[in-house]
Amino acid sequence: MILKSFLLGNLVSLCMKIINSVVVVGLYYGFLTTFSIGPSYLFLLRARVMEEGEEGTEKKVSATTGFITGQLMMFISIYYAPLHLALGRPHTITVLALPYLLFHFFWNNHKNFFDYGSTTRNSMRNLSIQCVFLNNLIFQLFNHFILPSSMLARLVNIYMFRCNNKMLFVTSSFVGWLIGHILFMKWVGLVLVWIRQNHSIRSNKYIRSNKYLVSELINSMARIFSILLFITCVYYLGRIPSPIITKKLKETPTTEERGESEEETDVEIETPTTEERGESEEETDVEIETPTTEERGESEEETDVEIETPTTEERGESEEETDVEIETASETKGAKQEQEGSTEEDPSPSLFSEEKEDPDKIDETEEIRVNGKEKTKDEFHFTETSYNNSPVYKVSYLYKNQENFNKIKILDKKDEDKGLFWFEKPLVTLLFDYKRWNRPLRYIKNNRFERTARNEMSQYFFYTCRSDGKERISFTYPPSLSTFGEMIQRRMSLPTLEKLSSDELYNHWIYTNKQKKNNLNNEFLNRIKALDMGFLSLDILEKSTRLYNDTKKDYLPKIYDPILNGSYRGTIKKKFSPSIRNKISLENFIETMEINKIHNLLLPDTDYQEFKQKIDPFDKKKRFSTEISHLFTLISKFDRESRSGLNLKGPSLFSENEAKLLKFLLNAIITIANGHKIKQKSFGIKEISKKVPRWSDKFITELEQQTGVIQEGVRVGHQIRSRKIDDIVVFTDNKWNSKNRDKIDLIYTIEYLQESDFRRNIIKGSMRTQRRKTIIWKLFEANAHSPLFLNRRKKSPLFSFDISELMKLIFRNWMGKGAELKDYTEEQTKRREKQEENNIKEKVRIELPEIWDLVPFSKTTRSLLLIIQSMLRKYIILPSLIIVKNIGRILLFQPPEWSEDFHEWKREKHIKCTYNGVQLSETELPANWLTEGIQIKILFPFCLKPWYRSKPKLRPSYRDLKKEQKKDDSCFLTASGMETDLPFGSPRKRTSFFEPIFKDFLALRVLIRRTKHFLQGSKETKRGFIKNVLFLFLKRIKKELSKVNPTLFRLKEVYESGETNQEKGSIISNQTIHNSFNKIRSTDNYSPREKKIKNLTDRTSPIRKKIKSITKEKKKGTPGIKSSPNKRSYNVESPKDIWQILKRRNTRLIWKLQVFLKIFIEKIYIDIFLYIINIARMYTRLVLESTKKIIQKYKYIYNNETNQETINKTNQNTIHFISTIKKSLYNIRNSKKNSHLFFDLSSLSQAYVFYKLSRTRVINLYKLRSVLEYHGTSFFLKTAIKDSFGTQGIFHSELEHTKFPSYGTNQWKNWLRGHYQYNLSQIRWSGLIPQKWRNTINQGRITQKKNLTKWDSKDRLLHYKKQNAFEVYSLPNPNKNENSQKYYRYDLLSYKSINYERKTDPYIIYGSPLQVNNNQRISYNYTTQKQKFFDILEDIPINNYLGKGDIMYMEKNPDRKYFDWKIINFFLREKVDIETWIKMDPNSNKNTKIESKNYQKIDKIHKNQIFYLTLYQDLEKNPLNQKKHLFGWMEMNQEILNRHISNLELWFFPEFVLLYNVYKKKPWIIPSKLLLLNLNRNENVSDNKNINGKQKWNFFRPSNEKKIFELKNRNQEEKEPADRGDLGSDAQNQGNRRFVLSNQQKDIEEDYAKLVLKRGKTKKQSKNKSNVKVELNALLKQHLLFQLRYDEGLKQRMINNLKVSCLLIGLKNPRNITVSSIQNREISLDIMLIRKSLTVRELMKRGVLIIEPIRLSVKKDGQFIMYQTIGISLIHKSKYQTNQRYREQRYIDKKKFDESTPRYQRRTGNRDKNHYDFLVPEKILSSRRRRELRILIHFNSRSRKGVDSNPVFCNKKNIKSRSPFLDESKRFDRDKNELIKLKFFLGPNYRLEDLACINRYWFDTNNGSNFSMLRIYPQLKIR
């Protein structure tokens, strides 16, 4: 057995080795290449088929030999790089294939072309045989075309990179190809033989009848092959980048508005007069003097060089008449153009800036003859650098314009020097200009930038790089970097580091890391020691070195500072207004053009020397060229005005000699041979950077052109091909106008044609043949996709391979215990079926016009049919029906109804519509209706009725009106004469003429049957029936008489009711006696009917008893409550009455319903009564408690206005209390509904675990004390709490246990298990975990109890306790004043849990999950004004919170704030004062008066303001009121938005529901404080400039007022210190606000200036339009992510309005149709009020525009938690500062300190810019150095103990000895220190599975591929 397995294993391994061997892979690859059939196969087959005889055999041999030789060369090219470059480039196809194919095409058609006669002496001298050989050889080198060769080429590249024995691979692949080729040729030969010998083919009738067909076929074989060759030729013609077929777009010299990223040309033509330059043009590098004066437009395309006539010409719109454009072929990939000054205006030049010409300009002189006069024009310099070490090319490609210039002559000096190869460069650039649109590239427009970046191919490039000290293969290595490295290696001798072995390299890496770590550690310790010695902390802090500008006496801006990197180089946008730019002299704008010295290394020496000789007179002084090149490349681009005066603060950057040299270079004037002067004003050094190429053209689509996109008043041609569209004329204004007689105004809409879109926005002239693999399997494929997206498309049943539904059906019982399938009620199933049916109908309706479009002339036929049907219906069919009906009535002796019928017939109108249903008019047909098709809409369709009502009702009832509304007043006519509701819809049923007649007959028939049944029945039934009829008849008479004489009949009714009661009582007593006697009777005597009644009574009696007992309990349980918890009334009739009603019914019905009744009553008992009892009890208790607390609060505040010490005790905010009530009620009410939000999280990743750990207090029983001593009514047993001890792993602990626990393995695991399901909020979990997964987990876990829904497990019990108890924030006893100064400065929850035993009676304050008692901060009111250095952490739980800083990559002061409680003030102070807004300043007096406006209810909402609190209005009930959409983002959820306010939740406090619910659901996304203010900032800017100390900044502003709203409810004594706090210590924030406003004002000025310029040119735009545009631009500029959208419902209603308006415009008397349209809601009147001149603000007010939220944080929930995890070491101030005015006044230089603020602090905290809480010593170092230190500690930890050996955090003794400042307060107990250690050094010491966090955070990278395999597991142990 062992032997067998051994042999089997060896066999498998042997097979694997063989399969993976190089030979087998090569054979496989070679066999694959057999199927890559190229054009050479045509020649090979031609030789096989056509040639016969001796010469034919020789040709076959030569063809095969050439074929194999060519393939061998292809395989050799795989191994031999130069051959591969030659054959693998498109040059080969262009140079070889096209001429050769064309030559063969002509040769085969002219047989005598090469016919020299046959020479049989030596067959090899025969030219035709040699040609056959050459054909097969050369054509084999061409690219294959039947199977794409790219796949095989990639296979080769990958395998060549992998395998070692490359030559063996090449040889084996050739052998494989040879085998495949031989097999293929043998198969072809067999097929030919079979065709010749097959009798069935010969005996074919067609072949026999055409005797000469076979001979003709053989004779025309040459022609067939020549046709095939021609097709191949055309195919290749399409694939090459040829300039002949593809269209080169003319680059338009339009003066574009470009925003902030505009660029300028490098060549500036200096004139005797000062040039007027455009707004944002930069200085140029070379000034060339010319005698002409030129005014230039705003921005000139770099690749356009316009040569102007001698006359002065303003460059404007129509320049093309006077310009000749010399279009340059741009650089290929190697030459990347540098940006000059765009970084100053655009922080990301690689994305948003245009291409510039290369700085390496080569002179070129053009001599231009204009109208016979010779004139020397400007010199232009262009370079063309090839990809890899090719010579430098120049461009001399001209675009000739014969209209303006007779002769253009270009004298090219350099070309003359080059000699024979002068043609080389123009030819290559002509054929291979990569900037031409001859590739199917998309032009993807950005919303902000019109020009677009080119879509380059993705760079998958294999190269070796070092990672973690080892050589690794990187597949995303930038190829430009590798070629750059190769160039450098050829030019310079680099250190021979690569010769070292990998182990030596790794050791070297470890050594350098250790050195770095030691240096950092030493520096760190030195700084801490200096702190211990008492130095100022700001001197100890590490500050980054900054570049200093001596001339300006200021630091260089961070964005330009080369020393700073990473996040410091943020985005700064500098803008200059046009007036300032015009004033600044051109001398400051001019930059010189100087060669980047690094090109000395890259370019070939000859060219470089030639260049130096041409432009550099200092050529002989080569001694400094290389030195300066090294020096200059170190320096980045500096500020343009002070390039010569840059110094580091400290030692000088340049030595004296270098400084002289610089000065000499900077002020040099270079003279060129032709006498022009080039002034070098300054020296600009350029960084080597890769630049994303950007198209210089601004393209528009076909659609934009047709819709009238105008560029500076000139309608330009489109360059992007859109989907085919048709213009449908809606309305033609034919009114004759004396001024414009020829002008006819057309109003038209655009319609897409029903055909596949193969254009797909491709640029004109781009190649089509390369767009392969588009599949079509429908009649109409709107978007042709490749099969790659097949799985994302809606599959047809034939192609759907999804068996998941089948698997669910089969294995649904295996899906886990308790999984339940949803029970659909009958109504739901019906609704679903109806929905499916409607979907099918809609699909058919859409596909029908597609079928019509496919059939030729179908639209014409259908249009004619419709018109015929319309005429027939209107004038023949309907009148004839009317005549027949009325004749029939006359014959039946009925009065005829001619007038009524013809009146209805006249009402019917046939409206001609467009093909899509846009109504035009009754008489006018749309233009081109025969070709494009029409629809005919019938208004008020005539329906023939047998009779009309004789007397119409005076007042129609509501039901009748509803019926009339439901009745459709319009339909469309089909080609078959039927009616349909929608165009191409299914025909609808017509109301039958005979239906009402049959109804009457049916009623008669039923009456006859009933009477017959009545007559045949028994006497008893007759009597009962007569009695009932008489009783009802008498009752009706009595009612009528009681109206006449009410008093008499009321007395009678009272008397009768008494009698009936007596009768009832007697009946019941008789019944009971009868029942008791019945028990004695024998059962045999019963009739079947009596048995049924007895059984029924026996079953129902216990049910009745139960119902009675329940109602009694209910009455006892809720004595004082009359209303139910939710606003529905449970008016259930008493069971007695129900029984009486049922008893009166027929016994058959009772018998059927007995089971149902039982189930129904049990349901009522379970679902309603117990629920009501429990809810009612809870609410009564809570209401009583709340009223008690509110009364206490009012009393206390009234009595203690000036008593400062007792404020703490009274500081219970009712909103906190209410929120706790609401939270508990919400949990109880929604625990069943939201139970899917809490679940078992066994698969949670470590990041979430550590997030939880960072928020958890010490694991001791202090916190459980509050659970045990919870003062509310407990719904739990003590045993459950004891059980929970075991789950936390602390069952063995005792209450007095205060020692900090050691975290071994067991404690770690137990700790993770017992953390309350990682207490994140419900909202957070719902965002993190997919909904379906949650549902499946929870289906089996929900357990119910009658009084409480208890969820999941014992841990959830603790979670509930935690929700009720741990949101209770405790304060110390206010009598102990000496402790209050300390305790308020750290975390209240931590303090409570740690020091619980030492405090006897902590005061409970109820806290909201969203808020914290910021008023507790009052006790910062120190007796002595001693400034504390550090604030201890206030670690408020952030369950439902995301702050501004939590959003990744946000700047410190964005225009949007993300939920700071400061922002809510704009909302609450204006509308509602819920909290006591108390503010105490540290510097204020103790006896400061505090005025608080408490518990003011919701004020009346002012209708003149934008903000409306209509969030909870039901959309269906309020369809016309669109105001609720304005702030719909508050809820973020449409379902919540649609919920009505009459929800069960929180109905006791309706005054708080609106405010609380808005912020409770998803509070982290709130619009900017300036959002609404900026909508009307034209009015506000001037007002907001002067914010003095007394004014408050309000975030909210009424729309019709022009002053800033001042805050109320503050007295003056409080206001002054508050103002100091607001505008003094917070001066920076205020400054930022002013800065924002001033910037916005500048933006508006710029926008207006641009508009004025435009208006001066076009003179057509109206003022209103410009105002709207300015407002919109201002709004879009502020909100970087575009958030404006319009309401979808509004869009549909506007379309409906348009359709009806089109009809009404064409009607002479539109009144009737207008009224009916309004009644049918086809016209929305509220939309018609929207004027064209409405501003953005008004549109938002009306609900037309909606502000969308930025959902960054919601999408990045997981990332947010990761960042929270990593930022544990960070101590930040409370994010929940509700009191906006409070600021602690600090005396530390903010500017200097901000420099050392790490990036992630902006994510997680420090939003007040008070970064002074340095409890963690690591913050001494800068962020980058801190990261370095941490990661080095990890990488170099050989032993696990080394991880924890950071000297600062070893143990308490070390902390005391080394760093006493940590323990500055001796009152800190040991537990507190241990807690600080845990929380603030958890960062670098925890286990982290999700190392993407480390990757993003520590290394400033976003690419996680390098770290995917890395895992760090330090031991979590603090000794």
Curated annotation (Swiss-Prot):
InterPro entries: TIC214
Comp. bias (Basic and acidic residues): 1606-1623
A biological process from GO: protein transport
Annotated spans, Disordered: 250-375, 1107-1129, 1606-1636
Composition skew (Basic residues), residue ranges: 1107-1117
Subcellular location: Plastid, Chloroplast inner membrane
Membrane topology: Multi-pass membrane protein
Top-level taxon of the source organism: Eukaryota
Parts forming coiled coils: none
Any Pfam family hit: Ycf1
Record family assignment: Belongs to the TIC214 family.
UniProt-listed PANTHER family: PROTEIN TIC 214, PROTEIN TIC 214-RELATED
Subunit structure: Part of the Tic complex.
Stated name of the protein: Protein TIC 214
Species of the source: Panax ginseng
